């Protein structure tokens, strides 16, 4: 094999004495490959999907299988030259020892996967492209083989401490969003164009569809060492941000269409001016909020990597910390401004919508230039759009509940219960996804001790994912108590904190998170077994289900409180 400069590429490995085999030195001179396609891949500096010939993969050199180096070669040496930058050549993502697929224990079943293209017959995704067996680069003269990377072991206490601050920040962000929604519900646009309430969960859910998915993908990339190279890192960041803007614009437009349809069904009334207003407000809000939050998210991921914090623990909560507040404030401001222009400057709304839609082809071109995000442009729409529809149904429940003057107090708590549930389940999904990327290959699950069936297997066990589920569930009650008391101190909402109200509210919150965590455990493993990337597919569904479950359980709680006569302060006064 040669790099772009035409020099031969060699593998150099040496084992430590502790490995039991003494020092061994293998030098493998690979055949020169002259191919324009290969050189283009080297020059692109972006991880790509390709299929490696099984004959080359299992070529026997000096009596030793390349794919089956003995256990004596578990520690590999690097040659460092000051004028060269090296990129890694690693198989840790799909062939880690804990899955039973160690190089020294190749079986016929494992050999079948050696030449397998993980995109054939399966849903390709950005992380799939990012985590293939080998990365090719043109920056170094040598290809270096490294041992499998592992996330440092963390106790439940360390995990809880890392999650605590981002969790509280995210919680206070949702509290702020709830208080803002409690205020803006009295604005003219929310009173006269009630379909805006249907937009609220769908647009707030963009943090689950886009921001948290971005955070999870980049967290996985950091944990498996795919953002160590500055060029690879910025290629992934730029491609992901462009992709996210495409998705935000499309989802914003479709959310407006869903709000128009769901708002028309109950009463059968349709207003063209209101429809244009909804489309303009939704598209503009989705675009601006997604861009701001995406930039913040990239900063969080890069900062976590530099400080040595596991980004799986902090990225997804911080992605949502002020996301709800930013999105809701932008939606209220834009929709109210466009509503005030309906009579005198009626052409402003369609121009705003057309402007942001016209930018979509530019973002598509940028995202398509990066192979790691090009696949998501084709295969990543199903979960995003489906999640938007699910969140819109939750918005319809909110719109119907707010229409009842006795239940208007639900507004301030809706972003809180939805946001907290979505944040916690996104952390769990991101952690499970990283675990699977490090311990197995797509389509196969790692060997795990058999336990009881769902939902209890999620919470009972000694595995790292069991511990994280337990820790996250324990955050629910103290977290919500803090946020409820904060709302009470700010004198926001229309509901007094009676004992009965707190008990009923906490029961709904615990039931929501308990349900989401075991669904996440089942869903992430199911997507992995089907060869789909859980980072891109599971989190949109889970956060949308969190919105739907949270809104529905909260509405039932307020109905129950009203029926049993708990109207102190009055519920919904």
From Swiss-Prot:
Gene: Slc41a2
Bridged cysteine pairs (disulfide): none
Pfam families per the UniProt record, alphabetical: MgtE
Extracellular topology ranges: 1-162, 217-245, 304-313, 369-376, 428-469, 520-543
Spans within the Cytoplasmic topological domain: 184-195, 267-282, 335-347, 398-406, 491-498, 565-573
Family affiliation: Belongs to the SLC41A transporter family.
Protein name: Solute carrier family 41 member 2
Localization: Cell membrane
Entry's Gene Ontology molecular function annotations: inorganic cation transmembrane transporter activity; monoatomic cation transmembrane transporter activity
SUPFAM superfamilies, A to Z: MgtE membrane domain-like (SSF161093)
Function: Acts as a plasma-membrane magnesium transporter. Can also mediate the transport of other divalent metal cations in an order of Ba(2+) > Ni(2+) > Co(2+) > Fe(2+) > Mn(2+).
GO BP term, example: cobalt ion transport
Membrane topology, record value: Multi-pass membrane protein
